[in-house]
Amino acid sequence: MTQTLTQLMNERVVLLDGGMGTQIFAKGPTLEDYGSKELEGCVVLLNLSRKAWIQEIHERYFKAGADAVETNTFGANPLVLAEFGIPERAFELNVAAAKLAREVADSFEGGRYVIGSVGPGTKLLTLGHTTYAAMFESYRTQVAGLLAGGADAILIETCQDLAQIKVATRAAREAMAQAKRKVPLWVQGTVETTGTLLVGSDITSVLHAVEPLGIDVLGLNCATGPDEMASHLHALAEASPFAISCLPNAGLPRNEGGKVVYPLDPEAFAAKVAHAAAQHGLAIVGGCCGTTPDHIRALAPHVKNLAAPHRSPKLERSASSLYLSTALRQEPAPTIVGERTNANGSKAFRDALAKEDWDALVEIAKGQQKEGAHLLDVCVAYVGRDEVRDMDLYLSKLVTQVQLPLMIDSTEVPVIERALQKAPGKCIVNSINFEDGEAKARKILDLCKAYGASIVALTIDEQGMAKTLERKVQIAERLVKLVVDEYGFHPSDLIIDPLTFTLGSGDEAFRGSAVATLEALKAIRHRWPLVNTILGVSNVSFGLAPGSRHILNALMLYHAVQHG
């Protein structure tokens, strides 16, 4: 029985094909090949009109030594095809492309594989070019076609927008679930010469955002050559728990006499990629723009004898924004959450929200960043206003202008989902509890799992807020069992709040509450060392005079940090 693609990856480095577009255009397609002037340039139509061309290209790459070829579907999602007036043909064209590649792969002895190519499209979700729902359905349709046509893996490639990566991976998983066919899911970002994706994300931010999404490969392709990718491959090698792929261009392109020229000949390209594979522990290599069957033929003997890499990556558990990642455990502690972007806690924020002064709201967030906050708590709940709409509009402005990761603060499931659709990075959702049982907590956890978010959980159950050490630890245990054991979240993605009560109420029942909270912090850290904790420290002094509040807050913060 032929081994699976995953089995091959466990044995040795896997070799993919090279560029498809240049090979197609070298054949000189005409209007007749496309069918009409309006369809000119829609190369995915050649999967139907010029099947022999596409299969010949696949065959040449297999003969050059490739283990797998990518389907001719880079631009075959409905959003792209709509620009040619044929969005309804997406499924058909993806099935056709996958079947063409499948036929060629199966004609070779031994294991040869088909990788379903899913390109970035022409619209950036982060910049509001389309909606989350439209992009999700577009990718779901494309992946469904690739699966139906026999693809062995799905490759979401040449990614330029972190938000696009997240929606595409979720759509791919949905398509697999509907088809009852799970295949490896690969993601490749395109890091420009600026050192980031087109919208500004570095590769580490991408890693932290996709880490909870259950992909199998995270790598790089396009834009630059092997040399320019080195530092980004190093970052992945150090931290990524996923297999690493590298499909560079044949060097940095340059313009010579009006033509795009790639400087690396097959031998030079092969030497550089082989060096990168050995140095960074690459699992998959191949080529992108400017590479040909000759480049793959030159690369094959260098990498096909390389055993599957064995790395020991160390991933620092983090939240992330569009631009950067922030460790959940800061050194020195604590991690500071800015709360002035909260309509319940800031009059200035609430007043600006009432006026729909979005620029002022963004400036408040920028102020929190300047003052040293590590995360932003965002809450737009305001009586009489549409919270879903406000969250949508605010995050549309905020995510491109502020670097801090977001803590989404809402009790409403639709608001949380909209926020997770708008925020490109790895967010934290604030919060769940068991006040009304587990039903609502489970709905929120379902969203966090689907969108790759961490979760704040309060020590509140059906009996109310936990005031004693015993009750706090008891509810914490219940939270760990639900979030970590049942839902499968990494322990660090659970952030438990053992609750802080005011000492200014005069209520005898709360006299020892601060000590109980501190002891709960210590107990949680000791019993579940990877689980994180959080406190609303200033709650301890609520109702006291300003001078007293500062002193008590500082004292509580000091002891909270000492207790874990």
Where are these predicted regions, by residue range?
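Domain-level signal for soluble alpha/beta catalytic cores
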Residues: 1-564
